[in-house]
């Protein structure tokens, strides 16, 4: 006879169940009872009064019938409102530039008890070793850190140079890991729609789990075909009717509000009582400065309530229960008997003011998390080592020749969006007919010795200086934008010297730089230190012109060939709408 009861993503022994049942019946002593608390009812609306009873990791009972129940410890909630722990439905922790350990320290006290992350940033640089490190971090975390197995490494075959592959055989080795919830975003949507066998093999292999999508702006028969293949959700929607159509066709909608891609205002009007079980919240990419100053999922909930008048129970529903159901995490997302005791106590539910957080039945202490961070990071055995196999460059590497009277393609940036427009500009002896055009280059950093791929960028707001980074989705080559070849070379050489990182150059000097020693993506500094360094970088960048709110995150997506319309990879200028390389000069 099997001596344990298994759920999809957690395991509880028969002995634990017997103890939990005894507390539920009132025959045994609870570990904790939370008194003076109201529970927000995410199913019916309104509130439930009465204590919350906890045994081990689980809730044993809820309601006034437990007012006199015995407990080893009682927590006085002082009239707080209790809600389930918040869940981020899709993110890349690497984009915070924090390690998973530091990320937990920064976000768990804000109520973020669960994350569904795709570590494809580090997998693109290091391959399976990067995924293995994330799994080690997830295993030791207090926060529920679940992993989607990265499906597109690189993002699009044959369009860029990256650091490693992640084969189906390697992916399958992680499929049954207890922290794995499914297959991460399938970015090659044209390949799926056309029925490429290699992609269908991946979908088939993970079909019993959750299949994440990625299809910005997709509609019509192509969207139908993509969903027919089994894709279940999308976090890339940026227009109201696009989101509505995906919901109508059975997709779940992840409403994203990151540091660069900000889609909440466009999509929040869709949320209602009927479709909220199919709506989730995610950040995708959010930097440590915003987390420290504005928050994480708590910030998104606050905006739904204050700016979009979403009812409390619906706002908290899409931040927890909806996501838990979607990913089969049936032990999460509700404050109910038998559920894991991931609880956020709010002194003000409308303002999402977090008073206390419990995860897996234990109160969280922010100072303890900070004190243990260094030791826990060391225990995870981070994959240190220089991943920048690139020699220093000179200004001549960025020299472009232009012919007066000719027209040249320009990548046009849309502030706070990941999509770009493809426009053009005419060159004359006095320069381009647009004064906002600057230069952009992408340099592969994995030892292939390719010449820099160079192009033109408009709308970014760079009036002087140069910015360079090794955070450049998804292959994470070196991306640099600038007004002069000399300053571009200086910025690139600084990030090479740092072993990866971010840099701002102005007036011929490095004004600010941030080394990222893990894969050229992440720092080992504390969240507070990292936020301060990001603040200094942003201040230096603002001196270069009216840039996007998050210039480095916006810049990081200019080389991603799966988001429209015109991008630059290490192999050249890529027309995303045609899924083909194109020329800098317009000849057609």
UniProtKB/Swiss-Prot annotation:
Check the record and name the Pfam families matching this protein: Adenine_deam_C, Amidohydro_1
Q: InterPro entries annotated for this entry? A: Adenine_deam, Adenine_deam_C, Amidohydro-rel, Metal-dep_hydrolase_composite, Metal_Hydrolase
Disulphide bridges, residue numbers: none
Which Gene3D superfamilies is this protein grouped with? Metal-dependent hydrolases (3.20.20.140), Urease, subunit C, domain 1 (2.30.40.10)
Gene Ontology molecular functions: adenine deaminase activity
GO BP field: adenine catabolic process
Reaction equations catalysed: adenine + H2O + H(+) = hypoxanthine + NH4(+)
**Cofactor(s) required for function per UniProt:** Mn(2+)
Please name the top-level EC class of this enzyme: hydrolase
Enzyme Commission (EC) number: 3.5.4.2
Which keywords, in A-to-Z order, does the entry hold? Hydrolase, Manganese
Assembly and partners? Answer: Homodimer.
Output the PANTHER family linked to this UniProt entry. Answer: ADENINE DEAMINASE, N-ACETYLGLUCOSAMINE-6-PHOSPHATE DEACETYLASE
Similarity comment text for this entry: Belongs to the metallo-dependent hydrolases superfamily. Adenine deaminase family.
List the protein's name.
Adenine deaminase
Its taxonomic path starts at:
Bacteria, Pseudomonadati, Pseudomonadota, Gammaproteobacteria, Enterobacterales
């Amino acid at each position: 006879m099997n001596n344990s009861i298994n759920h999809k993503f957690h395991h509880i022994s028969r002995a634990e169940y017997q103890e939990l049942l005894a507390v539920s019946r009132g025959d045994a002593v609870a570990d904790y009872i939370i008194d003076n608390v109201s529970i927000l009812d995410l199913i019916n609306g309104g509130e439930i009064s009465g204590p919350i009873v906890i045994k081990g990791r689980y809730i044993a009972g809820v309601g006034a019938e437990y007012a006199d129940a015995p407990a080893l410890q009682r927590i006085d909630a002082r009239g707080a409102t209790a809600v389930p722990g918040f869940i981020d439905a899709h993110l890349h922790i690497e984009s915070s530039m924090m390690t998973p350990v530091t990320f937990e320290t920064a976000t768990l006290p804000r109520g973020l008890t669960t994350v569904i992350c795709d570590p494809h940033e580090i997998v693109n640089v290091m391959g399976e070793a990067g995924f293995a490190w994330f799994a080690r971090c997830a295993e030791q975390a207090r926060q529920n850190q679940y992993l989607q197995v990265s499906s597109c490494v690189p993002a699009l075959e044959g369009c860029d140079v990256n650091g490693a592959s992640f084969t189906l055989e390697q992916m399958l080795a992680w499929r049954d890991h207890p922290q794995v919830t499914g297959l991460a975003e399938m970015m090659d949507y044209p390949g799926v729609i056309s029925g490429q066998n290699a992609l269908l093999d991946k979908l088939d292999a993970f079909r019993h789990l959750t299949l994440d999508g990625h299809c910005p702006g997709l509609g019509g028969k192509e969207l139908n075909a993509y969903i027919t293949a089994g894709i279940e959700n999308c976090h890339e929607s940026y227009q109201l009717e696009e989101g509505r159509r995906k919901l109508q066709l059975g997709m779940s909608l992840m409403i994203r509000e990151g540091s660069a891609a900000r889609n909440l205002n466009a999509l929040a009007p869709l949320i209602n009582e009927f479709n909220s079980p199919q709506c989730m919240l995610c950040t995708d990419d959010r930097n440590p400065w915003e987390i420290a100053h504005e928050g994480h999922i708590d910030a998104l909930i606050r905006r739904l309530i204050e700016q979009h008048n979403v009812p409390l129970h619906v706002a908290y529903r899409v931040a927890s229960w909806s996501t838990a159901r979607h990913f089969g995490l049936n032990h999460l997302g509700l404050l109910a008997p038998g559920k894991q005791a991931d609880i956020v106590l709010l002194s003000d539910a409308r303002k999402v003011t977090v008073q206390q957080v419990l995860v897996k039945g234990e109160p969280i202490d922010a100072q303890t998390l900070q004190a243990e961070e260094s030791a826990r990071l060391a225990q995870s055995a981070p994959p240190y080592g220089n991943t920048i196999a690139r020699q220093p460059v000179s200004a001549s590497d960025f020299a472009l020749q232009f012919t007066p009277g000719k027209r040249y393609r320009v990548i046009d940036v849309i502030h706070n969006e990941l999509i770009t427009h493809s426009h053009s500009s005419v060159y004359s002896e006095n320069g381009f007919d647009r004064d906002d055009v600057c230069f952009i280059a992408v340099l592969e950093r994995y030892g292939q010795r390719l010449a820099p791929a160079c192009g033109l960028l408009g709308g970014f707001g760079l009036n002087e200086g140069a910015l360079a980074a090794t955070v450049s989705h998804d292959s994470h080559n070196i991306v640099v934008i600038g007004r002069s070849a000399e300053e571009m070379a200086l910025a690139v050489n600084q990030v090479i010297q740092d072993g990866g990182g971010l840099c701002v150059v102005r007036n011929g000097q490095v004004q600010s730089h941030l080394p990222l020693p893990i894969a050229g993506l992440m720092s080992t500094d504390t969240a507070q230190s990292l936020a301060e360094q990001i603040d200094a970088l942003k201040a230096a960048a603002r001196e270069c012109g009216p840039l996007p709110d998050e210039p480095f995150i916006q810049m990081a997506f200019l080389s991603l060939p799966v988001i429209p319309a015109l991008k630059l990879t290490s192999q050249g200028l890529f027309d995303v709408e045609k899924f083909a390389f194109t020329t800098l000069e317009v000849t057609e």
